[in-house]
A protein has these predicted regions:
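Internal helix-loop-helix
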Residues: 2-70, 113-115
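Active-site proximal loops enriched in glycine and acidic residues that flank catalytic Cys/His/Asp
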Residues: 13, 43, 68, 77-80, ...
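A short core secondary-structure module
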Residues: 102, 106-134
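Internal maturation/activation junctions in enzymes
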Residues: 3, 44-45, 56-92, 96, ...
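Short secondary-structure boundary/capping segments
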Residues: 24-27, 57, 91-93, 120-122
Length: 134
């Protein structure tokens, strides 16, 4: 996929993408899934790059999107032991450490598709006392 330039098909060229619309991407995803459904799942269903592009900031875009376009893998870490796939019940806590300049995670995720990925997009709660989706 990487040697064919398929990673980051819909991402802007400035990040190493092809800047294609969603239609050719969907066609490619269908072809890949027809040959190997498991690989199609990892390549397209877990397409975290779209989520990162839509909701990430410029720093995150420049740090992570070129890496994915170059062939590094991503996973979307959502499922927890007591929440299953009910994302409203996610309890993993994210706390920003001024001292370390990064987010610290406290909790458990499980059943992560592509869990050995290079980059992880993790769903966590960062506001004390929240239970709703934000």
């Amino acid at each position: 996929m990487v040697s064919a330039g398929m990673n980051g098909m819909t991402m802007p060229r400035r990040f190493g993408g092809l800047n294609f619309s969603i239609t050719p991407y969907t066609m490619c995803a269908e072809i890949v899934a027809a040959k190997d459904a498991a690989f199609g799942n990892i390549w397209s269903l877990q397409d975290c790059i779209e989520t990162l592009y839509e909701f990430g900031n410029e720093d995150q875009h420049s740090r992570f999107i070129p890496r994915v376009c170059a062939g590094e893998t991503m996973s979307m870490d959502l499922t927890e032991p007591d929440a299953g796939s009910d994302l409203q019940r996610v309890m993993l806590k994210a706390t920003y450490s001024e001292e370390e300049g990064c987010w610290l995670l406290n909790g458990v995720k499980r059943f992560i598709t592509n869990g050995d990925a290079d980059i992880h997009l993790v769903l966590a709660r960062s506001e004390e006392g929240t239970t709703d989706g934000r």
